[in-house]
Amino acid sequence: MFGIISAGLAPGIALLMYFYLKEKYESEPIHMVIRLFILGVLLVFPTMFIQYVLEKEHISEGSFVVSFLTSGFLEEFLKWFLLMVSTFQHIDFDEHYDGIVYGTSLSLGFATLENILYLIGNGVEYAFMRALLPVSSHALFGVIMGFYIGKARFSDSKTKMKWLLCSLFIPALLHGLYDYILLALKNWIYFMLPFMAFLWWFGLRKAKKARSVKTGGQPLQQ
């Protein structure tokens, strides 16, 4: 059991430290990162309950609905809602990159517990593939969500709503595509590899842009 828990924890902690240590100007208080990680862990339980109810009520049927609604939109909406409530007006949210730290912290808390539960049920031999795919993808959805939340935080009132909508719907769409590839496509690996390559490119590009701007600097480009 210790080996399974360690294998489940390791990729999430490693990715979280990677994005946390990339902050260029002023690192976020560690208590904020831990708090958001724990919130992400706790979010797994209501998410699983809602998904269970949707399945039992036959609302969630078919690969498309499961991928884009029950998984993609539901999970990203709940993460987005928690981020907005707990961080958007927080005094420590004073740099664009902070949104990325917050987004990855919460997303990786969610992904880490999900990963541990999967490995307990299916075996530690899946740990490597889980680290490459679901854990990494959750981290990158968090990066993208946090990037656009950061844009909204430091934008004027005319563009704030646009970036808030982007912060929800772009990660939800990408998450839905990820799940649809897994659930609906027969030779999914041939589609998943280029999709993950794109996701890493897109996420790291957003992280680099956010790191380049300090509060009071030039507005971030999309």
Swiss-Prot record:
Topology within the bilayer: Multi-pass membrane protein
EC annotation from Swiss-Prot or TrEMBL: 3.4.-.-
Transmembrane helix recorded as keyword: yes
Residue intervals on the Cytoplasmic side: 24-30, 122-129, 204-222
Pfam families according to UniProt: PrsW-protease (PF13367)
Transmembrane intervals: 1-23, 31-53, 100-121, 130-151, 181-203
Record key words, sorted: Cell membrane, Hydrolase, Membrane, Protease, Transmembrane, Transmembrane helix
UniProt-annotated location(s): Cell membrane
Broad enzyme group: hydrolase
Taxonomic superkingdom: Bacteria
InterPro entries: Peptidase_PrsW_arch/bac, PrsW
Sequence ranges on the Extracellular membrane side: 54-99, 152-180
GO biological process: proteolysis
GO molecular function: peptidase activity
A cellular-component GO term for this protein: plasma membrane
Function of the molecule: Involved in the degradation of specific anti-sigma factors. Responsible for Site-1 cleavage of the RsiW anti-sigma factor. This results, after two other proteolytic steps catalyzed by the RasP and ClpXP proteases, in the release of SigW and the transcription activation of the genes under the control of the sigma-W factor.
Family to which this protein belongs: Belongs to the protease PrsW family.
Record protein name field: Protease PrsW
Gene transcribed to yield this protein: prsW
